[in-house]
Amino acid sequence: MFKVIKQEGRARRGGFTCPHGTVQTPVFMNVGTQGAIKGALSARDLKEIGCQIELSNTYHLHVRPGDELIKSLGGLHRFMTWDGPIL
């Protein structure tokens, strides 16, 4: 659920809670096109720089490596070694 924390004019600051964590908005989302962030950053590195959420392109993951492989490895969070929210 999204909750507005502060509003000034048409701008607003808020947050939403998901099963894997809370995300404060506005937010910058790192893009893991095929389940990985370019630049060889680890999940720990991402947490250290304040990454709250990762964006993952499900179409690219469906094409390669494929849904069944991701499922057999324990799902997208385990495949990406990311315990936070994923969009």
Per-range role (PLM):
Residues M1-L87:
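Non-catalytic, usually N-terminal nucleic-acid engagement modules in DNA/RNA processing proteins
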